[in-house]
Each structure stands twice: as C-alpha cells, then as structure tokens.
C-alpha cells in the first residue's frame, strides 16, 4: 500500500488541494475504472478531506486522502 510522507498527510488534512481535473484509476474486482477528480469537500462529521471523482461511466464517488493518493498513483502506473 502507498504511504505518503507524514508532512504531506498533515498538509492535505488541514486543507485539501483541489486536484480538479487529475485523472485516477481504481480497481473494482478485476476491472480498472477511470475517472477525473471533479471537486473537494470536507466531511461534516469528522472533518476529513474528501475528493469527488466522476468516473468515465458517469458514476460518482467520494475519496478520502489515502484513497485519492492511491488512485492517482495507480493511474500514473497504468499510463
């Protein structure tokens, strides 16, 4: 599993960078699905940074920090 340096985790947790337009990839079972980051938000219950991903097939999903970093990394590896 991808582990970003601690200083990156602290910065992202305090103020999520928009990352709008970044491409991501996520593995669902045995199929890779691609999408783009379309926005950011903060979880009102726990204050966690969230990034909204709009998949190429039209689905939407919110990612937490560790998930979005892994998805960006996977896209880079597959490109």
Feature annotation, model-predicted:
Residues 1-79:
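Eukaryotic chromatin- and chromosome-associated nuclear factors
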């Amino acid at each position: 599993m991808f582990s970003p340096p601690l200083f990156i985790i602290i910065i992202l947790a305090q103020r999520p960078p928009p990352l709008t337009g970044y491409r991501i990839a996520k593995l669902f079972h045995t199929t890779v699905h691609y999408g783009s980051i379309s926005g950011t938000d903060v979880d009102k219950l726990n204050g966690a940074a969230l990034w909204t991903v709009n998949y190429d097939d039209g689905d939407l999903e919110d990612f937490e920090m560790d998930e979005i970093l892994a998805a960006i990394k996977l896209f880079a590896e597959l490109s």
